[in-house]
């Protein structure tokens, strides 16, 4: 009888304590989570880092330092003219670089630094300039870029990855590289493809 009485008393005590314990647990589970540093947004990139990342995104092992400068001027122009035209995979930031690109990222930084105040302009306006890796020996006009003219790009035929069906509007990066390796400055190479443009200091 004594044992039954103890069991009943314990049952009453547990019945009284259980709702309190449940409410404490539920308070914990609905508490606001703490924000870890991994949840905080990344520090915004400055314009120099963005230009480096865009230049690195177009890099090839064969490119000369002068070619990198030409690409940096082109990327600077396009980013200023239409920043929304770029996708996430167009950017290669230093912390994500690997292999040969990581080894030359210092050169890419130099090219970007030398180009950060230069833009391609037509009638004093920075306009988006389309580009391709290579052409089939000539660049084409396009209805979307009426300010771009067709020019000869015969040196693209010397490329090991030459494609007779490639259609390039604007600038051929392989052509720029050929011109830069054969005595042209970055500015001269760009203006070959864009004869109606000028390179202005911002």
Predicted regions and their residues:
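Conserved, single-site charged/polar hotspot
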Residues: 1-202
């Amino acid at each position: 009888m004594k044992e039954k009485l103890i069991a009943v008393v314990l049952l009453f005590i547990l019945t009284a304590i259980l709702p309190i314990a449940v409410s404490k647990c539920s308070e914990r589970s609905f508490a606001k989570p703490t924000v870890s540093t991994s949840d905080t947004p990344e520090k915004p990139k400055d314009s120099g880092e963005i230009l480096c990342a865009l230049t690195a995104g177009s890099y090839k092992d064969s490119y000369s330092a002068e070619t990198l400068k030409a690409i940096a001027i082109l990327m600077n122009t396009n980013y200023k003219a239409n920043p929304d035209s770029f996708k996430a995979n167009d950017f290669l930031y230093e912390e994500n670089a690997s292999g040969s690109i990581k080894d030359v990222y210092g050169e890419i930084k130099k090219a970007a630094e030398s180009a950060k105040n230069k833009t391609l302009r037509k009638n004093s306006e920075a306009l988006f300039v389309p580009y391709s890796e290579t052409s089939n020996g000539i660049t084409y006009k396009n209805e979307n870029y009426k300010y771009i003219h067709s020019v000869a790009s015969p040196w693209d035929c010397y490329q090991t990855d030459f494609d007779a069906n490639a259609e390039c509007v604007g600038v051929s990066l392989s052509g720029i590289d050929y011109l830069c390796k054969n005595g042209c400055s970055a500015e001269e190479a760009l203006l070959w493809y864009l004869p109606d443009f000028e390179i202005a200091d911002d």
